[in-house]
Structure formats: C-alpha cells, structure tokens
C-alpha cells in the first residue's frame, strides 16, 4: 500500500489578502463561490491517493489543547484527535470513540462505553484506555477550563470500557448533544505532567488517536501533511490514502 499522506495546503495570508481587498461579489468578479478540493489518483473503489485542502489558517500552534491555527481547526473536525461522538449527514449523533451511552437518574448520569477494547492506539503506539477518558475530563475542566464538559461534575470508572459521568442540573442531553461531538481525547501519559497545557507545544503535543496523524510540517511553505492510520478507522473506510 502506498504511503498514506493527507496533504494540507495552508495559504491563509494570501487568501485573506486576495479577498479582503475586493468588494466584488463572486458573480461580479467571475470567480465561482466554491471550488473542488484537488484530488489525485482516484481508483475504481473511490479511494483518493492524495487530497489537497486549502484553509485560511496559519500552521501554528500545533497542539491538541488549541482550536486555533490550522492544526487546531483540523482537530476540531477530528483529524488527529479522536472525538467522543460524530454527527452524520442528517446532523444526528453517531458513535465514535464513545460507542454507546445511556442516560440515567433523570438526566443526572451518563453511562458511557468507549472503544478501549478495540485495539485503538495513540499515534506514538501507546494503547487508548479508559484512564485516558477520565483524565480528559479532569484536564478539560480543571486545567484547560473548557466549557464543553463543564456540566460534568464527576467521573466513576465502572470497568475497563465504561464510566459514569455525573452531570449537574440534569444536563445529560445537553452534554451529549452540544458538547460530546467537540470533545477531543487527550493521552494521559503525555499531558498528566504538563503544568500549563494551554501553552504546551512540544513535539508530542500533536499526538492523538484519530484517523490521521501529523507527519510533516513546512512552515516556510505553509503546508502540513497527515498520514492515515490505516485503511479503516472505527469500522469506517478511510478513503483518502495520501
């Protein structure tokens, strides 16, 4: 199998300069409102060997703890970082790293099962465990001060795949519907010793457990390259190979 690399072209400053100085509408300028991403080498099975995406963000900072810059926006959309849930084409929540859930106690508890028994690893080869789930909640609430999980007041480990989230104000539905699709998992073995996670940009700050891993950055060319972790991820085909 060919090397699986997802190429990301980042020309934010140039794009902003071109469009920021013109008051013309797309119709007046003759420029279409959108253009297809560049693809190369599509085979009969619909697999694209290379996909190039332009985005109006700089390549820095490169850390799971930020949603700014190109890397942060890619993770917001679950490239390197694995999210708890995803939304389908009908905007309905679907399982991802959280494979099932049950709302108990009139909305004050979420019993959630995670894919910690499916052989998923972090991009450095370490296994993804239920301790990473518990750690993620603690990190986001107590150090990153994120609002996504602010309604979760406690976490109890049930077994190696399941936890109970205690939720304030009966906000279980809110937490699942408005937050879980944006929550990225953090590897405990990397982040537990970081005193200031919001400012950490070490080489291992990019390690996630999502479908693509960051393999190369060229700041001068403003490009980032991602590599697919395999042909499938969580049972779904990764149709972009390189």
Model-predicted regions and their roles:
Residues 1-51, 92, 105, 154:
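Short, low-complexity disordered leader/linker segments with a strong preference
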Residues 56-59, 89, 106, 117, ...:
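Solvent-exposed coil/turn segments that connect beta secondary-structure elements
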Residues 47-57, 110-114, 136, 163-165, ...:
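Short, well-ordered beta-strand elements
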Residues 86-92, 181-238:
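Gly/Pro-rich hinge or "lid" segments in bacterial periplasmic/extracellular proteins
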Residues 149-194, 213-218:
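Surface-exposed binding/hinge segments that line
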Residues 47, 59-67, 92-94, 173-176, ...:
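Short, solvent-exposed loop/turn elements at domain surfaces
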Residues 100-144, 158, 164:
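Aromatic- and charge-enriched surface segment that lines or borders ligand/interaction sites
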Residues 54-105, 138, 207:
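N-terminal lobe/hinge region of extracytoplasmic solute-binding protein
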């Amino acid at each position: 199998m060919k090397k699986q690399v997802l190429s990301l072209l980042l020309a934010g400053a140039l794009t902003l300069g071109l469009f920021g100085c013109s008051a013309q509408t797309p119709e007046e300028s003759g420029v279409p409102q959108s253009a297809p991403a560049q693809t190369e080498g599509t085979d009969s099975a619909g697999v694209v060997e290379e996909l190039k995406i332009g985005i109006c963000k700089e390549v820095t900072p490169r850390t799971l703890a930020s949603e700014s810059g190109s890397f942060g926006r890619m993770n917001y959309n679950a490239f390197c970082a694995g999210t708890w849930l995803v939304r389908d084409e009908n905007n309905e929540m679907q399982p991802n790293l959280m494979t099932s859930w049950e709302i108990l106690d009139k909305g004050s508890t979420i019993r959630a099962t995670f894919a910690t028994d499916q052989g998923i690893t972090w991009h450095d080869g370490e296994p993804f465990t239920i301790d990473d789930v518990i750690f993620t909640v603690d990190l986001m609430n107590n150090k990153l001060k994120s609002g996504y999980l602010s309604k979760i007041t406690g976490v109890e480990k049930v077994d190696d795949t399941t936890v109970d989230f205690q939720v304030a104000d009966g906000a279980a539905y809110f937490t699942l519907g408005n937050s879980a699709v944006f929550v990225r998992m953090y590897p405990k073995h990397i982040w537990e010793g970081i005193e200031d996670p919001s400012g950490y940009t070490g080489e291992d700050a990019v390690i996630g457990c999502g479908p693509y891993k960051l393999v190369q950055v060229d700041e001068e060319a403003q490009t980032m390259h991602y590599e697919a972790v395999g042909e499938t991820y969580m049972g779904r085909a990764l149709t972009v190979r390189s």
